[in-house]
Amino acid sequence: VTETLLDLKGLKCPLPVLKTRKALTRLNTGDQLTVLTTDPMAEIDIPHFCQENGHELLAAEKLEGGHRFQLAKGG
């Protein structure tokens, strides 16, 4: 399992979801992606993106000034 960090701090909707989608295309099923974002909409958008596209949301954490999401690429 590969673990990748994607720092999207400072980007606004819809860029965090678009860049997350692009990063996941380069990973294999089961690989993990950690996404850091400061966009308040990501709290809704990233979990919804995972649910709609078959990826697993392993963790969602509210940080000071943003969020950290840990995803596993679905098959």
Region annotations inferred by a language model:
Residues V1-D7:
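Right-handed parallel beta-helix/beta-solenoid
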Residues P47-G75:
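C-terminal structural segments of small proteins and small subunits
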Residues E3, Q32, G66-R68:
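A generic structural signal for beta-strand entry/edge sites
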Residues G10, V17-K19, G66, L71:
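Intrinsically disordered, low-complexity sequence elements enriched in Ser/Thr/Gly/Pro
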Residues L8, L15-E56:
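Amphipathic, hydrophobic secondary-structure cores in small proteins
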